[in-house]
Amino acid sequence: MFDWVNLETVAVALAVAYLALAIKENSLCWYCAFFSTAIYVWIFGDVSLYMESALNIYYMAMAVYGWYQWQRGGEQNSGLSISRWNPRQHINAILLIALATAVSGYALATNTDARLPYLDSFTTWAAVLTTVMVARKVIDNWLYWIVINSASIYLYWDRELYQTAALLVLYIVLSVIGYRFWLKSLQQQNLAANSLVNKVQTPVYATASANSR
């Protein structure tokens, strides 16, 4: 096995930078995500976590997509605003993750030497969906990441990726912080929207009152 410890350190540092910037809604986070995941494609393949390796190829593509969405994905090519999912969307997401986990977990268990195939599959498919949530600025992504990263800690520790396992402990803490930051931004966003509606309605009401005299 290649001595990838130093390379893992670089990937971890970039991953921390990604999350710190994402919390602040800074689109530079996607540059850090792209290069960090490029490194992890090789690392995970080397330790027989094939679903995780494939996941990071997907992450690289999503880094490009996420950057575009944060820059131009909103109305009139403006940046996206924070949103949240309704209960039905969460139920559909969970069912989709469960189905994909069962299918790919079985395929890996019967056809490859993959380690912990079902856990590997769960964290992979859950992360696939949650990354879309991040790219679309769905606030609930932070809660999903807490679950995914908690499960992934054991997966990486088992494969002796100790720095990455430690990174995920930090990720859980930062996910809580990220949720609080985005929730505050969402509240401010809603307050600004309500204020704008009131400003638009006030002149209409004033005109109607004047005409009735």
Report the location of each language-model feature.
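Early transmembrane hairpin module of multi-pass membrane proteins
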Residues: 13-18, 26, 30-66
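Short, flexible micro-motifs
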Residues: 51, 69, 163
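Membrane-water interface of transmembrane alpha-helices
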Residues: 58-75, 183
